[in-house]
């Protein structure tokens, strides 16, 4: 078999017939820059800046500097993340042996072309779809595709799907499907429509932005009309008031903060060899209630070892016999365990060998005229494992039991039993304990015997290990499946479709993450809210996942969860500071339209409050440790702070306007009072958010407070306010004192309303259950 010629290979490469799946793990620098520069809010802010320039009031376009700074930071963070991610190889040098022009050569998987002739031997991973041309006892493990652990004999013209592993024998096969057309990648495409890839936090923020965006244009137009045509203001005054109102409604800092915080999390994880392929993955992991995983590669490390021996014939030299039965060529986990224990020797005369096959369930070795059988007892003799009482403890533990026998088929003598166990990862117990402490339920979904998995969990002192079920026993009724899925801990002998159905059932009222590495995991990875692929897994499983553990180290998961919690909890904590401005700007704009009075702020005044009282402190607070479990109450928590404080700002302004109207005072003289009180209320919220105070938070709070008041005192002309005097200080002090009680009152009222709504929702839920 000569394979393809150089000319044939080049022809196929030039015609796009090479094994390139074109999966992009990061965006190009151009895409990163354009996506961060050309945004709805940047365009809107530039348009507003142009309007301000027409008034000649240059100091009122300082809000643009914030937008530029925000954009530069976002681009820098994403480019930094890209550099780190690009330096990590998701697929660790997968290679394949092909025959070209009669020579065997090893090439990277990306250089495989259609019709290539591939040489297969024991231990090889199948990276593309193949058709067998020649088989020498070729056996394939298709468990990553079918979930069945038994090896399948492959003969001429049989198909071997990508994701399979050659367990024994050798052969030649032709490449029939590559890249996106391979079985594994097709499965990814078929499953791609399953999942909504927007996270709770992103969805909530996007919904807020949609509402604001819808309101900005009509409110802005009406505000200008009111200011210019009805209030009798000049063009310049009307434009500045309108721009201030519109800018105030946009929580652009919240969008940037979310993006920067998530990207910083991605960078931190990448340094630990964890690739966050989709930004929302880190947030979803933080909210995870249920984690689904397989036994192999997570709890166990995929290797086995000999735990014990039960020798029936005390006269034999078990170690000598097994050392001569072992061969260097055998590479499956059981063979490696036997070789590690007994070694490989040639001290006895071996006259014949028949390799292990799935059909016979044993290997046969003829040593000095005597046949030795190594494998499953039921396939060697008429006896059963359960006939031997000394094996009962190992059967109950779910150990793999290998039988050594000798003689002719009709006169088999059982010599010994070798007890094999899975090697448990050193970090498994601590990792499982961590998730239990964090209130995350663990579900083991495996293709293995559920009893075996259950006993491994028992050895780790894992609660609920006895709650197991086989895939064939899963109920078909949807409601019953949800109940069983919630109550069961170990799911054994599961097919890919069954994995998907169980995860779908678990998602009914929970956030579910799943760890997988095989083609048979793809549907489950896609169905889960967050798919986590092991670095040693097939490429298709990686591309179907949000997160890739490049070192396949299960113990890094707590770090990912903690990082996600830090990001989400901190964003939730500071988001209300951005939405105060949105709240009072929207209310003030509507009141200005209805009551036809001038808008009380200039853009530069809002820029001062936004940068000193909100932007700077929120940026630092967002990077603090915060590992408490994430609750899905973003809207409730955020608006509990934003609404009372925002409404209080509006009440302050209304009182000042009424005071000026009743006592015939010039409103311009009292802008200082409005700006100072708004800054005070925002700083008061910052103080609330910083609790409990530590040294760092105290420094931050003092710095922001001093900076805000110092700028107003030193640069009143820049911020278009009057200087502090006795009247303004008294006014600010009195209203500031009253504000504290107003905010507390509105917060109590808010809590009562939320409690009523929750009670109403719970009643409806109970009624729906009964129905």
Regions found by a protein language model. Give the residues of each.
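Cytosolic catalytic regions of P-type ion-transporting ATPases
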Residues: 62, 93-206, 400-403, 476-485, ...
């Amino acid at each position: 078999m000569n394979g393809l010629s150089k000319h044939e290979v080049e022809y196929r490469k030039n015609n796009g017939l090479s094994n390139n799946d074109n999966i992009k793990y990061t965006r190009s620098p151009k895409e990163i820059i354009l996506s961060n520069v050309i945004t709805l809010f940047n365009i809107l802010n530039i348009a507003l800046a142009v309007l301000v320039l027409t008034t000649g009031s240059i100091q009122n376009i300082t809000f643009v500097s914030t937008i530029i700074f925000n954009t530069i930071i976002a681009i820098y963070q994403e480019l930094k993340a890209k550099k780190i991610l690009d330096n990590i190889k998701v697929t660790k040098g997968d290679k394949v042996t092909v025959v070209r022009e009669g020579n065997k050569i090893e090439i990277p998987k990306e250089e495989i072309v259609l019709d290539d002739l591939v040489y297969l031997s024991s231990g090889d991973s199948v990276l593309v779809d193949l058709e067998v041309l020649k088989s020498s006892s070729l056996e394939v493990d298709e468990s990553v595709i079918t979930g069945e652990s038994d090896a399948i004999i492959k003969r001429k013209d049989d198909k071997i799907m990508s994701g399979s592993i050659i367990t024994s024998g050798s052969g030649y096969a032709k490449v029939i499907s590559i890249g996106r057309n391979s079985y594994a990648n097709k499965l990814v495409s078929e499953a791609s429509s399953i999942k909504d890839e927007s996270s709770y936090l992103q969805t909530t923020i996007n919904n807020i932005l949609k509402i604001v965006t819808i309101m900005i244009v009509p409110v802005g137009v009406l505000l200008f009309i009111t200011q210019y045509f009805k209030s009798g203001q000049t063009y310049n005054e009307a434009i500045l008031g309108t721009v201030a109102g519109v800018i105030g409604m946009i929580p652009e800092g919240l969008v940037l903060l979310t993006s920067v915080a998530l990207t910083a999390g991605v960078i931190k994880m990448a340094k630990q060899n964890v690739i966050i392929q989709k930004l929302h993955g880190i947030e979803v992991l933080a909210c995870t209630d249920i984690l689904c995983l397989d036994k192999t590669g997570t709890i166990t490390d995929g290797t086995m070892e000999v735990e014990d021996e039960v020798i029936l014939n005390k006269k034999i030299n078990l170690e000598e016999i097994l050392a001569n039965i072992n061969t260097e060529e055998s590479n499956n986990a059981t063979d490696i365990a036997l070789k590690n224990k007994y070694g490989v020797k040639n001290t006895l005369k071996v006259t014949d060998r028949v390799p292990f096959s799935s059909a016979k369930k044993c290997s046969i070795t003829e040593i000095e005229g005597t046949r030795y059988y190594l494998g499953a007892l039921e396939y060697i003799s008429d006896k059963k494992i359960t006939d031997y009482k000394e094996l009962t403890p190992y059967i109950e533990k779910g150990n793999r039991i290998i039988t050594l026998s000798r003689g002719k088929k009709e006169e088999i003598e059982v010599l010994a039993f070798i007890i094999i166990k899975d090697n448990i990862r050193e970090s498994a117990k601590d990792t499982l304990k961590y998730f239990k402490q964090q209130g995350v339920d663990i579900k083991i979904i495996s293709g293995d015997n559920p009893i075996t998995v259950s006993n491994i969990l028992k050895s780790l002192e894992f609660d609920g290990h006895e709650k197991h079920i086989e895939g064939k026993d899963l109920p078909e009724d949807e409601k019953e499946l949800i109940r069983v899925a919630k109550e069961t801990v170990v799911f054994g002998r599961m097919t890919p479709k069954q994995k998907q159905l169980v995860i779908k059932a678990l998602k009914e009222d929970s956030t579910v993450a799943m760890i997988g590495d095989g083609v048979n995991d793809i549907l489950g990875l896609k169905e889960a809210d967050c798919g986590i692929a092991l670095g040693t897994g097939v490429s298709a499983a990686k591309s179907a996942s949000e997160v890739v553990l490049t070192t396949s180290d299960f113990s890094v998961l707590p770090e990912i969860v903690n990082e996600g919690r830090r990001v989400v909890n901190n964003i939730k904590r500071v988001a209300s500071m951005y939405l105060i401005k949105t709240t009072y700007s929207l209310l003030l704009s509507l009141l200005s339209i209805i009551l036809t009075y001038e808008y009380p702020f200039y853009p530069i005044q809002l820029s001062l409050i936004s940068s000193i009282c909100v932007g700077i402190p929120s940026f630092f607070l967002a990077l603090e440790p915060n590992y408490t479990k994430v609750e899905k109450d973003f809207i409730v928590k955020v608006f509990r702070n934003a609404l009372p404080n925002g409404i209080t700002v509006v009440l302050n302004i209304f009182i000042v306007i009424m005071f000026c109207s009743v006592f015939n005072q010039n409103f311009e003289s009292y802008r200082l009072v409005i700006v100072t009180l708004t800054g005070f209320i925002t700083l008061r919220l910052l103080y609330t958010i910083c609790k409990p105070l530590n040294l760092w938070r105290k420094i931050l709070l003092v710095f922001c407070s001093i900076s805000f008041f110092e700028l107003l005192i030193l640069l009143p002309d820049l911020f278009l306010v009057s200087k502090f005097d006795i009247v303004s200080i008294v006014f600010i002090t009195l209203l500031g004192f009253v504000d504290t009680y107003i905010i507390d009152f509105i917060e109590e009222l808010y809590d009562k309303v939320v409690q009523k709504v929750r009670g109403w929702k719970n009643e409806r839920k109970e009624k729906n259950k009964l129905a």
